[in-house]
A protein has these predicted regions:
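The feature captures the conserved acid-bearing segment of alpha/beta-hydrolase catalytic domains
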Residues: 301-370
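Catalytic-loop region of hydrolases
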Residues: 69-187, 288
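Conserved acidic catalytic loop of the alpha/beta-hydrolase fold
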Residues: 244-265
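Extracellular mucin-like PTS domains
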Residues: 24-66, 70-71
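Active-site machinery of serine-nucleophile hydrolases
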Residues: 103-105, 109-111, 115-126, 146, ...
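Primarily recognizes the serine-hydrolase "nucleophile elbow" in alpha/beta-hydrolase
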Residues: 264-314
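Bacterial signal peptide processing site
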Residues: 20-22
Length: 371
């Protein structure tokens, strides 16, 4: 199997693991036998193992470490009172009539999937911390400076309700190119479609909507690509991205009849790659304990340091170097890392390595690239 295919296969196994692990209040996970090798710092794929060419056959096996028994902590309940209510508009059909976000080189309808776009409007908060953020990830933050916003989400799911497996992956769309991209959909869409997942892409950051300094990508930012369609969108800045993402995930949980076409989710998992993984790292440490929106997190190709909690024009609150994953959430957090993420300039994840726990796992995949 090529490294890129292996990455995709493990990525989907991680998604399945998060859902399987959060399906009950407590579950016991058996040992992984030869599939994974463990060190005090991390759990890595064994490059010489036969299993390295074929992912684990069960989510429980793929999560397990060398410990004979691992107990997943009690999953906390979703706190609707800690998340603002959004107004949903859509499906959106205005403007040029096309959703500005690539789905791949095929027609979703040919595989029994639909795609719709919705606008979410509400009031989001930024976050602040009275104390400097520490490397442990056990941060205490408070909401501040609320601001109105309107963003968009894209929903892809099975047309036939009977094929829906109950799992929803909510992807923090990546804006490194100056416009919205969905790299984790690109990695995992074949297996997601086969298994019956719903995928939701969230425009959480300002650049994807308003554009930025990238001259090549500016024309594909939403407001530039289709001013008539995306004219109503408003983004107050990336300090608000965390709460916007929370509210989008909460809407999937509470307004599924409209957003998911009547498909009721059993598990809602947050995913994100590269810059989005940096954001998710900070989200897990700062915001997740406040809201408990998601049943698990797949943090794909991050570096040693999380994204800033807050930034200009609000107070600058950078993440510490390194930024570890807090271990007290009670839901799975899976770090999936390429070899580039470990050693690449500006990434250096080796500084953020931490021991595996009942809820935190790290998968390092030899021979693979960041993107």
């Amino acid at each position: 199997m090529r490294p890129s295919s292996l990455t995709a296969a493990l990525f989907v196994a991680a998604l399945c693991t998060a859902c399987a692990s959060s399906s009950s209040s407590s579950s016991t996970v058996p040992a992984a036998s030869a599939v994974l090798t463990s060190s005090p710092a991390t759990t890595s794929l064994a490059a010489t193992s036969p299993a390295a060419t074929s992912p684990a056959t069960s989510p429980a096996t793929s999560l397990a470490s060398a410990n004979p028994q691992t107990t997943i902590a009690l999953q906390p309940e979703f706190r609707a009172d800690a998340v603002g209510t959004v107004t949903v508009s859509g499906p959106i059909t205005s403007g040029k009539g096309a959703i500005v976000l690539g789905a791949g080189g095929f027609d979703l309808s040919t595989v029994g999937y639909t795609q719709d776009e919705y606008f979410l409007s509400g009031s989001a908060s930024a976050y602040t911390s009275a104390a400097p953020l520490t490397s442990t990830g056990r941060w205490t933050v408070t909401p501040t400076s609320p601001a109105d916003y309107t963003t968009r989400i894209v929903v892809r799911g099975p047309k036939d309700p009977a094929t829906f497996n109950g799992n929803v992956a909510v992807e923090w769309l990546n804006v490194s190119a100056g416009f919205d991209n969905s790299p984790d959909w690109s990695y995992a869409h074949v297996e997601m479609i086969r298994a019956g997942w719903v995928w939701v892409g969230v425009s959480a950051q300002a650049v994807g909507i308003l554009g930025g300094g990238n001259s090549l990508g500016a024309a594909l930012a939403l407001k530039a690509a289709d001013p008539d369609r995306y004219g109503p969108l408003v983004h107050p800045g990336d300090s608000y991205s965390y709460d916007i993402f929370s509210q989008a995930g909460a809407a999937v949980r509470t307004q599924w009849q409209q957003l998911l076409g009547g498909l009721q989710p059993r598990h809602v998992v947050a995913i994100g790659e590269s810059q989005s993984a940096f954001r998710l790292s900070t989200y897990v440490d700062a915001i997740a304990p406040i809201t408990n929106v998601f049943d698990g997190y797949l943090v794909h190709s991050r570096g040693a340091v999380g994204a800033a909690l807050s930034q200009a024009p609000l107070a600058d609150i950078p993440a510490p170097d390194p930024t570890l994953v807090r271990t007290d959430l009670g839901v799975p957090v899976l770090n999936v890392l390429s070899e580039t993420d470990l050693l690449g300039k500006g990434l250096g994840y080796t500084r953020a390595r931490q021991p595996d726990t009942a809820s935190v796992r790290t998968w390092e995949i030899p021979g693979t690239a960041h993107a």
